[in-house]
Amino acid sequence: DVCSSDREAQQERVQEIPLSELHPFEGHPFRVVDDEEMMKTAESVRDFGVLTPAIVRPDPDGGYEIVSGHRRHRASELAGKETMPAIVRDLDDDAAIILMVDANLQRESILPSERAFAYKMKLDAIKHQGQRTDLTSSQVGMKLQAMDIVGQEAGESRNQVHRYIRLTELIPELLDMVDTGQIKFNPAVELSYLASEEQKDFLSAMDYAQAAPSLSQAQRIKKLAQEGEC
């Protein structure tokens, strides 16, 4: 009806919001760093402004929580701006997480750790939305498991999504080595099945040997750990 259309239009209206009132999304898994790409973005914002409005939601503690637009927010700060354009939406936690993840997965360069925690957050949100994992996918008109939905919308197989999420079980030191390419993806997945203390022991051994494990070595270490021999 006319009233609901007016409300939707009002909700989607672009507003100029002070940067000081915009807060990062809690648990945001994507890094915002002042690298060369950020400097280019800041220069663009300085010259042309923010061309795509951020999406934010009201923060119960005051101001707004950024759902999509963390890099644009930082670039605006570096460009010396005081405000940035944003669309305010009333989103519950699950809807906000899904939107935040989907928006950031469009980036060209994403670290394995970022993708891992993003998939995990989205999976948990989809499950929580209805407390069921057989949610209906409108795209294909059939019931799909939550893991399948995450994969389908990211262009990944269910198995690959699961493997990425396994990386969230790695201790921070090993996960950093995956991000920097010191440990390859497949061996890292195998190492994620080790307990934290076993991972720490492995890290010490790896430092001593000055070498990263191959996939077969990681599989062997995982097998020994499961058999209680590691």
List each model region and its residues.
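Residues that form generic nucleotide/phosphate-binding pockets
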Residues: C3, S44, M100, N104, ...
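Residues at the start of alpha-helices and the adjacent loop-to-helix junctions
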Residues: V67-S68, K143, T180, Q217
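EF-Ts-like protein-protein interaction surfaces
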Residues: R166-P172, Q182-C230
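Amphipathic, charge-rich alpha-helical segments that serve as recognition/docking helices
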Residues: F30, R74-E169, D176-D179, N186, ...
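Amphipathic, non-transmembrane alpha-helical secondary structure
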Residues: M39-A42, K120, K200
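Short, charged/polar connector segments at secondary-structure boundaries
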Residues: D1, S5-R89, A95-S109
